Amino acid sequence: MQSKKEYSLFFIFGTILFAGIVLTQGNKPDLDQQSLFDQLQKESITELILKTNLEQIIANANDVDYGDGKLTFVNGDTSNVVYDIKVKPRGVTRKQICDFPPLKIKFSKTDLEANGMDGYKTLKLVTHCKEGEDFEQVLLKEYTAYKMYNVLTEKSFRVQLVKITYEDANQEIEPSTHYGFLIENKQELADRIGAELKEKDNSILTQIDANQYRLFTLFQYMIGNTDWNLSKQHNVKLLIENEKISPLPVPYDFDFAGLVNAPYATPYSTLPIENVKQRFFQFKGNRNTDFRSTYDLFNAKKAEIMCLHTDFNLLDEPVKIEMTNYLKAFFDLINEHQVADEKLSLNGAYL
């Protein structure tokens, strides 16, 4: 589906040019060396062509096996770059709901090394889910939510907006073009911030980094997202920075957030809210925790956060207005510290 809108975006990451760099020896990739994701990062949209057995992916969303494919990076005036890849459906809820599931793309380490890149072999691709303008807007809103967390902290998943043409290898399905976005590899995130992934290790939850936890929970409240759980590590990655003992929570998957408001999103039945547009604060900790420094950070970054959607030309104007009003209610609350402290209690808060 081709969009008639302009593509100009005003986001924080600068264009990173392709460069050949020799791979160093060692167990971890060289941090001075660019990754595939580094080379994809730019202010404008990355154009891709994915050719694979689309019929197999769409009909068998629960398939855990990779299928063969080719991914072409469209470089405009220069030569296109084509990679042989493996691709499979991924996700949980979206894999069941979407007509076109999210995808996991795996590159050959040999190909990456041959092109002067380090060894982060997999990337997640968030897809359009279903046909139609409404679902395109949902995807763009979720992308914007990731960018908002990037503004607040570098300890976050980077994302890259793409315009991707899907081609069926067997020519059984007509080619189609949609927006999507790629999510940074989790090991790359850990290496970038000098941390270690701690998956399936709940023993560390009692000593979670207090500053980052306040930021994490207040951000989830800002976007109205309750679809996360620390103890189950649901939609959260835990990382421990070098020489520290307190893990950092890093969120992902925001389609159930009120700010995104996906048509299929509903809150858990155990929560005292009727729809995802209602905020509920899920901070678990000392009732007397002082959030003022966290409020100050959000206020300092407010202009950048708001510009991410107001200056985003691919979002429809009614969507921008709705997002502005939703975020304004949050900022109005945190700027009334006494009221905010009463609402943001240990037992949750509504707004």
How would you name each of these model-derived features?
Residues 1-29:
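Bacterial Sec-dependent N-terminal signal peptides
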Residues 24-351:
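Phosphate/dinucleotide-binding and metal-coordinating scaffold of catalytic cores
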